[in-house]
Amino acid sequence: MSEPVIKSLLDTDMYKITMHAAVFTNFPDVTVTYKYTNRSSQLTFNKEAINWLKEQFSYLGNLRFTEEEIEYLKQEIPYLPSAYIKYISSSNYKLHPEEQISFTSEEIEGKPTHYKLKILVSGSWKDTILYEIPLLSLISEAYFKFVDIDWDYENQLEQAEKKAETLFDNGIRFSEFGTRRRRSLKAQDLIMQGIMKAVNGNPDRNKSLLLGTSNILFAKKYGVKPIGTVAHEWVMGVASISEDYLHANKNAMDCWINTFGAKNAGLALTDTFGTDDFLKSFRPPYSDAYVGVRQDSGDPVEYTKKISHHYHDVLKLPKFSKIICYSDSLNVEKAITYSHAAKENGMLATFGIGTNFTNDFRKKSEPQVKSEPLNIVIKLLEVNGNHAIKISDNLGKNMGDPATVKRVKEELGYTERSWSGDNEAHRWT
């Protein structure tokens, strides 16, 4: 038997907790199915990885929120509704992987011993929403434990420290966003150590530039803020329940603000059904409540110009009063480039850097060759029996039933766009 990797329900992204609270409050009886997709489908699995994953998935059923963890959540996310806190504090609150996860594998034709994974998660939305992050991080860890083993941890801490120092030297405010595609739990811990070492090298300057980490467990361990926006899942789910795509963004924002209060709205995610459609609804009171927006697909520089135009020319807001958080496949160089674009367009900039921190490795046998991360996602497939879809700002990130995607694009007058950064199979190479 293997040792459990995930030892706490806090080993997840903060936005899963806020979305969990919003689902519990607004949609307690909604049922969902999530589907796993490997966008880097050339990267396959072996039997050892599959058997290890089956064990690790089953261990998730042993986890409970501890009293100390509940106190931490109340302290760090004080706007979580008290009824939600009571719900997750109950000794009965747990995951039921044996009932909720369907996990099979299929041998690839002509490639014996090479398997693709088929994973579905089904149940009520409030009972299954916390699976996504632990499942993804475990799948990545399995791949690099049993399939691609031509790598080691050498210089990972130093590499993270150097990246953080470069970001700090350029005045860049960022969070670590790398849980879901980390090479391993140990890798993420080393990265956090490296980032904190860089912070402590010049604390007067750097403490305010490190916004925190999306991982609640590591935020708690390293004494930084847990950071969270919202995921596409929330907007996809709200849209799918009503099938009202014309008002989906507005309805999702209404539910969010009603749950947490306008002052805790945070950052708005604009691209679920294309940013152009989002901006039709993004006017007062929403544009006042949200401190800014998150960029997660399409051309970031074009996006910056579009958002700047909306805030400054359409809404007549003063320059440098709103934030763009860039979070799409970032590295240090891209962050520096986009920070200049934001400044030129009168926007404050923050950055969520994930895979480039927690899964940036080289082959041990050929150090000049990158050891490629998996590009894996777990997305809503169905909500209350209706298709759930995501369109985003570039073709490579369309998700869900093709006929529904086509119909909604027509309904919203969606304009197709692709850009040079749109290669989902080799996203970080």
From Swiss-Prot:
Positions with a binding annotation for 5-phospho-alpha-D-ribose 1-diphosphate: T355
BP term (GO), one: NAD biosynthetic process via the salvage pathway
Keywords on record: Cytoplasm, Ligase, Nucleus, Phosphoprotein, Pyridine nucleotide biosynthesis, Transferase
A molecular function GO annotation: transferase activity
Pathway info: Cofactor biosynthesis; NAD(+) biosynthesis; nicotinate D-ribonucleotide from nicotinate: step 1/1
Annotated family: Belongs to the NAPRTase family.
Name of the protein in its database record: Nicotinate phosphoribosyltransferase
Record organism: Saccharomyces cerevisiae (strain ATCC 204508 / S288c) (Baker's yeast)
Gene designation per UniProt: NPT1
